[in-house]
Amino acid sequence: MSFLEIDFFQFHARILKEAELPQLTELCIACTDFFQLVEQQPGSEKTAREILQERPSNLPISHKIVWGFEKDFKLVGVVEILRDYPHSGVWYVSLLLLSPELRGNGYGKKLWEAKVFNSI
């Protein structure tokens, strides 16, 4: 599945690919506070590329899924998921990131509780 509508948030979700690098870069820059805290560096195009490409060396790229969440045609969130990591049958959520204007409103918790990720 590459597109999912989450009506109760007016979000659209889709799997992100390299073509969305500019939008993901914009989100990473908007979330610089998070990246400063976690990685001691600002969000950037490099950060966006890492979200799309980096994974454990023994994990095929086909086992990495990056969901993007859009609201009003703007990328406002991302979820990075690794399938069969750290071992077969396990799904690992390595990042759930929302733009600053959406934080603190329960969106992350509601997305998690809605089991959006089960629709993959």
Model-derived regions, located:
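Conserved N-terminal entry element of GNAT/NAT acetyltransferase domains
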Residues: 1-19
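Conserved beta-strand in the GNAT
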Residues: 68, 74-83, 92, 97
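Short strand-connecting beta-turns/loops that link adjacent beta-strands
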Residues: 18, 72-74, 86-88
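Conserved GNAT-fold acetyl-CoA-binding loop/helix
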Residues: 32-54
